[in-house]
Amino acid sequence: MLRLYHSALSPFCRKVRLCLAEKRLEAELVEEKYWEKSSDFARRNPAGKVPILRIEGKALTESMAICEYLEDLHPDPELIPKAPEERYEVRRLVGWFDDKFHQEVTSKLLYERVIKKISGQGFPDSKNVKEGARSIKFHISYMEWLLERRRWLAGEDMSLADFAAAAHFSALDYISDVDWTRSHVVKDWYAKIKSRPAFRSILADQVSGFPPPLHYNDLDF
């Protein structure tokens, strides 16, 4: 069986988990306290990051590289299109959420509100929290613009771009940091994607000391 070293609220780990589940690949989940920087963890990935996927004796790192590896091995269902323009758009949007959105929103809200506390790094920086809360409004507007022109974020079919975005939004939704009233279009998109069977384990996540809001695992929120 595959083994995934992960952190429950990490959007990068969630993206890989969604990819695995959508392709019906079973994996043992091993919670990794990456901030403790244990010697075993350092041997698994000297970069000191999760996720790490153990497969056929190899330790795969970097979430996008893992997802592309899984796509090559298990192309059905397709999450990264083969047509160059469509493939580009999926990769562009995965990059958007994993780089720009993470830097401007997820890292400021999730890190400050949760990671700092569970890793013993002190109290939230209110300036960062305010910046993250302000920045997410722009990103929701951009997503609304995309979704008014397409069925899914990158085109007419659901793709890894949707999973990348949903991985970030689900982590933020766990800590009640998404104002779903800002866009019914984005809310409908999220309700649609969280209803997929691949999302079940994500919605079952529990982080000690941080209970999710009641709507977190409600498919009709």
Predicted segments, located by residue:
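GST-like fold's C-terminal all-alpha helical module
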Residues: 97-195
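GST-like domain detector, emphasizing the conserved glutathione-binding G-site
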Residues: 1-130, 220
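A late-sequence structural motif
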Residues: 196-197, 201-202
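Acidic/histidine-enriched, glycine/proline-rich intrinsically disordered or flexible terminal extensions
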Residues: 206-221
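Positions that flank functional sites
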Residues: 34-35, 158, 208-209
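A generic structural-conservation signal
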Residues: 29, 156, 182, 202-203
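Short, solvent-exposed alpha-helical surface patches in well-structured domains
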Residues: 89-92, 188, 201
